[in-house]
Amino acid sequence: MSCDNSAINGMNPGMAGFIVAKKRVMELNDSMQQGIVYLLGAGPGDPGLMTVRGRELVEAAEVLVYDALSSAELLNWAPAACERIFVGKRASRHALPQEEINALLVKLGRAGKKVVRLKGGDPYVFGRGGEEADALHEAGVPFEVIPGITSAIAGPAYAGIPVTHRKYCTQFTVFTGHEDVNKKESSLDLKGIAGAQGTKIMLMGMQKLADVCEALTGYGQEPSTPAAAIQW
């Protein structure tokens, strides 16, 4: 199907919008004829915060490789024939080790599948998307990264907390409270974080909250600093 702008301009707005949307879906299907893996950020859980591009990909997927998402509604967008594979992680409970997830994505991509790797938040914000992208690149499997809304921004926003404010805060720091347990040394610079200005956002840190707070105050963070613990 072809559809140029001059043809669209001569139509009523409703029909033009339908044709553009149809063309977009056909282009998506064409791009997915070859095996490809989409590393898709699902956002913080509210289905309404998924991007339009993300929903289009889920609706066209042949295989959905998904994490422990907050909303099962996202899975219902996939076609009935779509294969659904759960690889989620909760604290120390992993359905599959990360290395096996990487291998699975490579295998599915090489098999010519249209794979959507559905990840909570944003793939590249503590989502291990970088590791999966590395594995796909090294294996020569085509992939694309689709950003999602990170909970580092959405969580505070839903709680009524702006991470920046022109009068009070012109920078923010995001760090993890859950590092790789196989690391020989921590790469988390809590001393530097304590001395940094602006809002400080810790993700995946409820189990380490007391230890991190003690470390930050030990490095000079003012104990009276306003703080919030946001969990859903």
Question: How would you name each of these model-derived features?
Answer:
Residues 122-196:
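Class I SAM-dependent methyltransferase SAM-binding "motif I" and its flanking Rossmann-like core
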